Amino acid sequence: MKQISGNKLFVKALKEEGVDVLFGYPGACTIDISDELYKQSDIDIILPRHEQALVHEADAYARTTGKVGVCLVTSGPGATNLVTGLATANYDSVPLVCFTGQ
């Protein structure tokens, strides 16, 4: 049986779900996933200056395209900086998925 790393499996799953844009802010806990994302060209990576901007950009992307907004941030403050944007998307039933490091 062929083995595949969790990073490759994560990126493969995103592609299979039709994700073509990801809003991400790399950090220590997600650096391996970020490295895997940068090796491919099917998913465009938007790198903002702050996680709060990232989640609101993903929300706007979902609202304007009808596609799911996908976020990837590191643990700790990276994750907590998503809260307001997640609440906004949840309140308005906007399709938004956020992944954080552990």
Task: State the predicted function of each range.
Residues 1-102:
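N-terminal alpha/beta PP-like core and its mobile active-site loop of ThDP/TPP-dependent enzymes
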